Regions:
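Acidic anion/phosphate-binding donor-loop and adjacent secondary structure
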Residues: 194, 207-221
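Charged active-site motifs of nucleotide-sugar-dependent glycosyltransferases
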Residues: 3, 219-224
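Carbohydrate-associated surface elements
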Residues: 188, 206
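An aromatic- and histidine-rich active-site surface loop
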Residues: 81-90, 105-125, 131-145
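N-terminal subdomain of nucleotide-sugar transferases
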Residues: 1-59, 181
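A conserved catalytic-core segment of Leloir-type glycosyltransferases
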Residues: 35-97
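Conserved small/polar residues in nucleotide/adenosyl-binding loops
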Residues: 230-237
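Membrane-proximal helix-turn-helix segments that form the acceptor-binding/catalytic region
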Residues: 113-116, 120-124, 137-140, 152-182
């Protein structure tokens, strides 16, 4: 049986239905999928579970508003200095790679993490390496890609954000350069990412043939309809739409 290792920033029952549907289709085609992802407490896409063996790495345990922010800052500090988040992902993947004969590694993210964990694993194993970027930092008008505010002085926030953005882009682009293939969600994304890897493929987001399919309706009138897809980001809730 063909086996695939997926390393991603989030996975159902939390967000990232793109990877959830991929696993659903791959299992139908006879593939066995292993997913290593960050633990996120959310059940929005619970209906997409059960199609892969999922291993979650938990970074955050605090429950209070203030303690959550402090913990987030601490994890970010450890990650910047020591690559903390990447090392935990790598440590979770190593025993899986040793006991399974994977055909390739796929890393999906909306920003950079966990590309910097998937890259050395792909290089070390010499497995085909595919990167899937659901969103890219360049598409944001401001700093919406950062999940928390730093809450320091305004000038210091601006300095930290600028350095943080530059660091994320550098790490992402370094990973793209060694990927065998890159997939993304729109023609514009393709053109941006081709600067770092010439083999970029377009796979549109938000389409599932089980939900959207042609249906014949008997009617005496000619009706024009339109279909729209609303992208729900991980930090948003439906009532905000």
């Amino acid at each position: 049986m063909n086996k695939l290792l997926i390393i991603c920033d989030m996975f159902p029952p939390a967000f990232a239905p793109r990877m959830g549907y991929l696993c659903k289709y791959l299992t139908r085609m006879g593939w066995e999928v292993t997913v290593v992802t960050e633990y996120i407490e959310d059940n929005t896409f619970e209906f997409l579970t059960g199609y892969a063996d999922v291993y979650c790495v938990r970074y955050y345990k605090a429950s209070g508003k203030i303690s959550k922010h402090i913990e987030w800052m601490w994890v970010m500090f450890l990650d910047i200095l020591f690559g903390y988040k990447d090392m935990k992902i790598i440590n979770a993947c190593i025993p899986l790679i040793k006991t399974n004969q994977y055909k390739g590694i796929l890393c999906s993210t909306y920003r950079t993490f966990p590309l910097t964990a998937a890259k050395p694993l792909a290089i070390h194993t010499n497995l085909p390496f595919v990167v899937d970027l659901r969103d890219i930092i360049e598409q944001y008008a401001s700093n919406e890609y950062i999940s928390h505010k730093f809450h320091t002085f305004s000038w210091l926030d601006a300095f930290i954000t600028k350095r943080f953005r530059k660091r994320l882009l550098r790490k992402r682009n370094n990973a793209l350069e060694v990927a065998d293939c890159v997939t993304t969600v729109s023609p514009w994304h393709v053109e941006v990412l081709k600067q770092y890897n010439p083999n970029v493929k377009l796979i549109y987001n938000g389409f599932d043939p089980e939900l959207f399919y042609p249906q014949q309706i008997k009617t005496s009138r000619f009706i024009i309809t339109s279909v729209s897809y609303t992208h729900l980001r991980a930090h948003e809730t439906p009532e905000h739409l």
